[in-house]
Amino acid sequence: MSENKCPMHHSAGGTTNRDWWPKQLRLDILHQHSSLSNPMGDDFNYAEAFKSLDLAAVKQDLLALMTDSQDWWPADFGHYGPLFIRMAWHSAGTYRTGDGRGGAGSGNQRFAPLNSWPDNVSLDKARRLIWPIKQKYGNKISWADLIILTGNVALESMGFKTLGFAGGRVDIWEPEADIYWGAEDKWLDDKRYSGERDLEDPLAAVQMGLIYVNPEGPNGDPDPFAAAVDIRETFARMAMNDEETVALIAGGHTFGKTHGAGDAALVGPEPEAASIEQQGLGWKSSYKSGKGGDAISSGLEVTWTSTPTQWSNNFFENLFGYEWELTKSPAGAHQWIPKNGAGKGVIPDAHDASKRHVPAMLTTDLALIFDPDYEKISRRLFENPDEFAEIFAKAWYKLTHRDMGPCTRYLGPEVPAEEFLWQDPIPAVDHPLVDEQDVTDLKLKIIGSGLTISEVVSTAWASASTYRGSDMRGGANGARIRLAPQKDWPVNQPEQLAKVLKVLESIQSEFNKSGKKISLADLIVLAGCVGIDQAARNAGVEVTIPFTPGRMDATQAQTDVESFAVLEPVADGFRNYHPTQFSVSAEELLVDRAQLLTLTAPEMTVLIGGLRVLDTNADQSKTGVLTARPEFLTNDFFVNLLDMGTTWKPTSKAEDRFEGVDRVSGQPKWTASRVDLIFGSNSQLRALAEVYASSDAQLRFIDDFIAAWTKVMNLDRFDLR
């Protein structure tokens, strides 16, 4: 058959909608990871499957693998441990605090772009090495869990005592479309910087395709002082302080080596660009054998210690024990060796017992002694190796578990008993939960409290909508909305919030005197449900709003103010809160927040319509409140938005505020934001708005709003799943 008669032209990649309209709103990020791409089926429960796993047997198999060197990819120093530590580190190390995305929690290293990042050269081989073990234990252990467990076993096999391991990471089955890795279109480019050295939010790596920093120094400039600046910024953006940063770098570089045996130009394309016969592997090298002593990954050729497969203090011993001078690897990369020929014969060769080498360091290693603050920490850990081991163990555990959410999600026999502040602890339920009659009595108290529908709904939404599905932080459980920093966030209307909380705390105190107890976290959510119930009744519809007690109240001591500060919304389209003009549009920020709330496009749409008519704007303005009867749960927002009797015009230079006027008389009718108008402008969102604007849609609208509301209220109720 000739090519022009082929019935499958789409396989060649035709022009897409985004090719025609690059600024088209990305709603596809709201519909990822569905049952359509997941082979496991809706009835598969990974937590239950993991509980049936013989973890000790898996670890024993991994331990045997560590020294079972394969001809197709020989182990450095006869031990795969350092390679597997790098695999686990680079899986977890993509996490960033800004939006909670990245990290080890989904097994995303198997997919583009991470599987093909320049910083992940040869990790395709690491995953193939553990495939027989994944194959053996099947669905009882996810790739995400196995990758981190392998890193732990690697450390243990080389004499290090880890803090523990928790399972519970659920695999995804397609690349993540929601994560913004940067605007660059070339590997290792750094358009993400502006000004002096201001890194774009929420990014936490210095260049496209790197996990953290350039090991040669900023943009390849071998300046340890400048490297320290980058290290401090990037590690802080993944929740590590200076002490943890030093311990992680020194601990990780106690093991193994880097690979730069020859010219990096001889390395072939990454896995996503490699030929089909390579079967998902990439970076095929034509330099000599391309493996073992001929391997090329970063282009650096560094072995830090004389004990590369054994935990020791030798990294610090060498770092402080020599004066260093700049040199280049065989691949031409900047690295450092001892001055005046010192250190000859100290370092073993990774594949030839007859060869010896000098110690070598990266520019980023030297930053640990050039930067004054890092130097103090490095010297202390050098002089106190037991403290070094303890800090590294805790930092490694944090690194590999930071994106798993609360400890209640942790699975397995190796979960540490200690709970850490970075895990956002919440006390366990210590009292009988309220029953149906108690809930009825409390509802009557709330109704009679004088609080408005808008006030209680706004407060419940503010409490629950901090949740991020990316790292499972935030949410209504813990009632942290009453604590710093959340109580002072402008988006939460601190004055109104204080008023509502005072009333609810009074109701709670009175109820708890009866011998039964309800947490403020539960009461805040219940009050929101009462508000919706009243609003539906105002609209002539009797409804039952699901409410499940079981939340508890965290204390200020259990709340890291700095850590929680990153959860503050810079914008919240659900509350029409847009205090700052960004290069990203308000509607894009809305979709991003909806994705973090794990909402679909229909759920996002119905929530916007409901929250608007319930009058919940953060500034108490009437922007987007497209109804003459606020606090009535009606579909008025959609009806009036799609009314062809209204025309819209911008009222601000930035075109982020609009006025709707009568098409005939020109009389003002409404005001709206970009977030409001996008539901009439975007074709996909308009299609959804039309469903809810139809004359027969009122009951559907209320039912769908209640379902989406309940979902948000329970996002952090992992005990209900």
UniProtKB/Swiss-Prot annotation:
Cross-link position per record: Tryptophyl-tyrosyl-methioninium (Trp-Tyr) (with M-238): W89-Y212
One Pfam family linked to the record: peroxidase
Biological process annotations from GO: cellular response to hydrogen peroxide; hydrogen peroxide catabolic process
Gene Ontology annotations for the cellular component aspect, listed alphabetically: cytosol
Site (Transition state stabilizer): R86
UniProt catalytic activity: H2O2 + AH2 = A + 2 H2O; 2 H2O2 = O2 + 2 H2O
PANTHER family hit by this protein: CATALASE-PEROXIDASE (PTHR30555:SF0), HYDROPEROXIDASE I, BIFUNCTIONAL CATALASE-PEROXIDASE (PTHR30555)
Protein name as annotated: Catalase-peroxidase
